[in-house]
Amino acid sequence: MTTQVPPSALLPLNPEQLARLQAATTDLTPTQLAWVSGYFWGVLNQQPAALAATPAPAAEMPGITIISASQTGNARRVAEALRDDLLTAKLNVKLVNAGDYKFKQIASEKLLIVVTSTQGEGEPPEEAVALHKFLFSKKAPKLENTAFAVFSLGDSSYEFFCQSGKDFDSKLAELGGERLLDRVDADVEYQTAASEWRARVVDALKSRAPVAAPSQSVATGAVNEIHTSPYSKDSPLVASLSVNQKITGRNSEKDVRHIEIDLGDSGLRYQPGDALGVWYQNDPALVKELVELLWLKGDEPVTVEGKTLPLNEALQWHFELTVNTANIVENYATLTRSETLLPLVGDKAKLQHYAATTPIVDMVRFSPAQLDAEALINLLRPLTPRLYSIASSQAEVENEVHVTVGVVRYDVEGRARAGGASSFLADRVEEEGEVRVFIEHNDNFRLPANPETPVIMIGPGTGIAPFRAFMQQRAADEAPGKNWLFFGNPHFTEDFLYQVEWQRYVKEGVLTRIDLAWSRDQKEKVYVQDKLREQGAELWRWINDGAHIYVCGDANRMAKDVEQALLEVIAEFGGMDTEAADEFLSELRVERRYQRDVY
């Protein structure tokens, strides 16, 4: 079925909204399209009185704006739950993604709620970077008439725990805003804290905002969504692993796997740019080692989410064993009165360093103690799924999903250790074995709506994964836009991931340019950011031609170095000073011409 798209000037949608609409409907049957058409007609007409040209007096009450700033989807889920709570309380509320928020309107907000996660070294999620920059710039307005609350999600195993939320909270207050509630900083197991916070927010807002008519709550507050899949983070699909192929050479220092998962007839859909969530199981050998070190048997009964399970099963399926945290080290030291660990208590930097260099099982080995099963369970954090950038397009692979997995392997005093999810996929799931998966949609990492738009892809290491999906999609669409890939890794002969595929794309004319950086093949190390500077003049020409820039990979070093190189290219070839170049790149981000998927 072919749909003729009218000229953009005649459309009430902006290009990004149009792209989302096209992506959401591209694989629907005529019957499904007819149903969707009726669905939206019903949404428009379900409350005609509330949508009349003359608003009811209650429409002039202060509305509540919730800004969701999410990296992995958790903040978005909390924000959606709060929106639903407020609608149930008949309050006038709207929910907006940080990337879609017109941040200059913040001065007119009366009641503002921010739900945000943190990425990298205390940075805001990608979709909130522009808003964060604006608030911390000289352009930020005074907010004396704004009351606000912030819920911050983070991971206490990282040094800059919940830093993004702390930033938003302090800056909103500095600009004159009034706190409705004190900020809440939630760890990985955030659900209970979020539930309690939502109830407090509803109570606080009930006393401030007049109750809206039900029709107005629906018309202005609801974000209508079509859920086409029954599978989610909490209800994953049980799929099967069909391919597990090592794609680095035998002499490579890296073990990178190409993993293919068969989705069967589940109907699970995804787009290039999305991530695959994988629920993994801990290595039974690791469980056995930990249990024996604590002089336990493994059959002791423990309670997990209201259910009684044997300790071994609980540890294998429900608790994080491969990532240590400062809190775990501190609590273990306090519980066991370890002479080695007690001196670290109270020193956050030392606790974090110890946690980063010493896995939980080795902490117990180095500082032995005897804990009962319940004490062990209470010490640990719940197991959470790992997210992998999807390396395929369903336009080519149909009912499969591919990911590129860098297997984490290292030694601690001669004992082999491995990452939980990566070693699960690489070592412990046999062919046709079960894998529990779900799709984490990422609307902040999408191909341009216009197939003629040039694309610049920067993805060293496993950061190349989404660009394989991009190229599969562009090839399937026969998109005429130019494509330029920057890729880097240590060695050409050992670490050129998907080499044959990239060479084929070049030969077929789908991949216009490819620049490669091999950091260990010569005396002087060369990285992708060096290639960006080297090709600065041509890069600037592409940007002037409307190219979209995509970056995927390590957030802590690579992404920052790449951004610095881009700023230098913009300044040099665009004839700008540092401040103007930064403003230019920020505008590209706002226009969704500069998108990052970093971790």
Swiss-Prot record:
One Gene Ontology term of the molecular function aspect: sulfite reductase (NADPH) activity
Cofactor binding notes: Binds 1 FAD per subunit. Binds 1 FMN per subunit.
Positions with a binding annotation for FAD: 322, 356, 386-389, 404-406, 410, 419-422, 599
Positions with a binding annotation for NADP(+): S519, R520, K525, V526, Y527, V528, Q529, D561
Enzyme class: oxidoreductase
Ranges annotated as spanning the membrane: none
One Gene Ontology cellular component annotation held by this UniProt entry: cytosol
Catalytically driven reaction(s): hydrogen sulfide + 3 NADP(+) + 3 H2O = sulfite + 3 NADPH + 4 H(+)
GO BP terms in the entry: cysteine biosynthetic process; hydrogen sulfide biosynthetic process; sulfate assimilation
Functional pathway: Sulfur metabolism; hydrogen sulfide biosynthesis; hydrogen sulfide from sulfite (NADPH route): step 1/1
EC number: 1.8.1.2
Pfam families: FAD_binding_1 (PF00667), Flavodoxin_1 (PF00258), NAD_binding_1 (PF00175)
Ranges where the Flavodoxin-like domain occurs: 64-202
Domain FAD-binding FR-type residue range list: 234-448
Oxidoreductase listed as a keyword: yes
Cofactor(s), names only, from the UniProt record: FAD; FMN
Positions contributing to FMN binding: 70-75, 117-120, 153-162
Keywords tagged on the record: Amino-acid biosynthesis, Cysteine biosynthesis, Electron transport, FAD, Flavoprotein, FMN, NADP, Oxidoreductase, Transport
Family the entry assigns: Belongs to the NADPH-dependent sulphite reductase flavoprotein subunit CysJ family.
Role played: Component of the sulfite reductase complex that catalyzes the 6-electron reduction of sulfite to sulfide. This is one of several activities required for the biosynthesis of L-cysteine from sulfate. The flavoprotein component catalyzes the electron flow from NADPH -> FAD -> FMN to the hemoprotein component.
The protein's assembly and partners: Alpha(8)-beta(8). The alpha component is a flavoprotein, the beta component is a hemoprotein.
Descriptive protein name: Sulfite reductase [NADPH] flavoprotein alpha-component
Species lineage: Bacteria, Pseudomonadati, Pseudomonadota, Gammaproteobacteria, Enterobacterales
Gene name of this polypeptide: cysJ
